[in-house]
Amino acid sequence: LMIITLTANPSLDRTIELGAPLAHGAVQRAVGAVQDPGGKGVNISRALQVSGVPTLAIVPGEATDPVLTALQAVDVEFTNLPTGEPIRSNITVVDPDGTTTKLNAPGTVFDAELRQKLDELVVERSKGADWVVLAGSLPPGLEPTYYSELVAALRASGYETAVVEDGVEAL
């Protein structure tokens, strides 16, 4: 069994824990902070790897990006599509009572050339896979129909596909 994941809009997820409730406009000290590679597809590949299921994460970003070096550190196999841009950061602020405030950056802007390269990489790396999972939000420049169009292309080539995202159009 081999599962390929595509995370079109990966992130470096930073979680900051506060000792007092978040106060708008104030300077506050954190009592804890962690950062992890993120994005739904990345998270799926991490869970599969921990479970012993072969997986390959396809991630747009530079090979030296902290998200990709973090994936290397936890032995998640990946292939990257160079974008010339850093992978976005998402920030979660956790109040003492557990209330969370999330700030999600938009991600790398995709033009037609970058989209074509991503499509080609997904099709190329999916050869021999049992499943291809398209997961997470779409970055700027990829239309809401992107996943449904990629699913159609993958299914036409005989691949089993799954999509994990809210609001996917035309599936």
Model-derived regions, located:
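Glycine-rich phosphate/adenosyl-contacting loop at the front of the ribokinase-like
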Residues: 1-56
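General beta-strand structural signal in soluble alpha/beta enzymes
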Residues: 6-8, 59, 79-80, 133-134, ...
